[in-house]
């Protein structure tokens, strides 16, 4: 049920353990008096998790980091213990994982990040500036690929403004919002796909959703695995079908066959 995800039994049954990072003095609020909890859903990301978390510690030191593992078989959760404040273990479903992470979080602001992004400098200041406006329900970062070719920059610009028009943003954009509003909305709808877009639209119903001046740098790994043209066209098709009301189970089937490499299906 949309809006009921955060209280589901899957979240209630999630196990939570403290990471080594919990021992540091990170409980002091930022200069704005607001503590930010970063929630990272992962599955089999052993090669990325430690360098990513170390990067987050450097760019966003005054935050609580919660890694939510969806049943990894490569030791991802164990590797995360060095830098994370809490490790949450639950079943593999991004919405379930993010809701479980939100339940374990202690911050006033929840920031949902993917493990393959690079944070801009002063990212916490960007979030604080965005949420100063009481009419803003939440926010997100624009994204770019490292050393983006011109065709991708053109596609990104089109997708950005189309997303504003259609009120659609995915999890790559690092969506953030106040904890109280997240709880009022019931968290992410625990759907098989488009949970981030659904939640983004829920935020829009409660106020303006603003984007920051700085960008997240996202990994090109999926474009490299699937192919830039194929992935761009697939994303556009799925977004169009979603806007047209095609059932999510159909979109999930299409996504698995067009947006994932063979090894990840």
Residue positions per predicted region:
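Short, well-formed alpha-helical segments that are part of the catalytic scaffolds
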Residues: 44-59
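A conserved acidic beta->alpha catalytic loop
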Residues: 55, 69-77, 117
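Short aromatic/hydrophobic "clamp" motif used to bind/position activated sugar donors
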Residues: 110
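Acidic helix N-cap motif at the loop->helix transition within catalytic regions
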Residues: 47-51, 74-82
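Hydrophobic helical membrane-anchoring modules
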Residues: 2-19, 23-32, 201-265
């Amino acid at each position: 049920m949309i809006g009921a995800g955060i209280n589901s039994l899957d979240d209630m049954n999630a196990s939570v353990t403290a990471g080594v990072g919990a021992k540091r003095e990170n409980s002091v609020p930022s200069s704005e008096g607001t503590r930010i909890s970063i929630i990272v859903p992962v599955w089999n990301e052993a090669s990325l998790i430690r360098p990513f978390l170390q990067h987050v510690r450097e760019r966003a030191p005054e935050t609580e980091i919660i890694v939510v593992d969806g049943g990894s078989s490569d030791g991802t959760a164990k590797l995360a213990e060095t830098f994370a404040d809490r490790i949450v273990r639950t079943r593999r479903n991004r919405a379930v994982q993010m809701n479980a992470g939100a339940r374990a979080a202690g911050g006033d602001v929840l920031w949902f990040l993917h493990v393959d992004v690079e944070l801009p400098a002063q990212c916490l200041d960007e979030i604080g500036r965005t949420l100063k406006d009481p009419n803003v329900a939440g926010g997100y970062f624009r994204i770019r690929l490292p050393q983006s070719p011109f065709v991708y920059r053109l596609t990104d610009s089109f997708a950005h403004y189309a997303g504003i028009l259609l009120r659609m943003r995915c999890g790559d954009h690092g969506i953030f919002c106040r904890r109280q509003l997240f709880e009022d909305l019931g968290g992410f709808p625990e759907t098989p796909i488009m949970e981030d877009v659904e939640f983004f639209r829920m935020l829009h119903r409660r106020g303006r959703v603003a984007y920051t001046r700085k960008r997240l740098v996202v990994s090109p790994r999926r474009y490299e695995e699937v192919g830039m043209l194929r992935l761009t066209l697939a994303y556009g098709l799925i977004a169009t079908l979603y806007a047209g009301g095609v059932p999510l189970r159909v979109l999930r089937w299409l996504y698995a066959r067009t947006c994932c490499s063979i090894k990840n299906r």
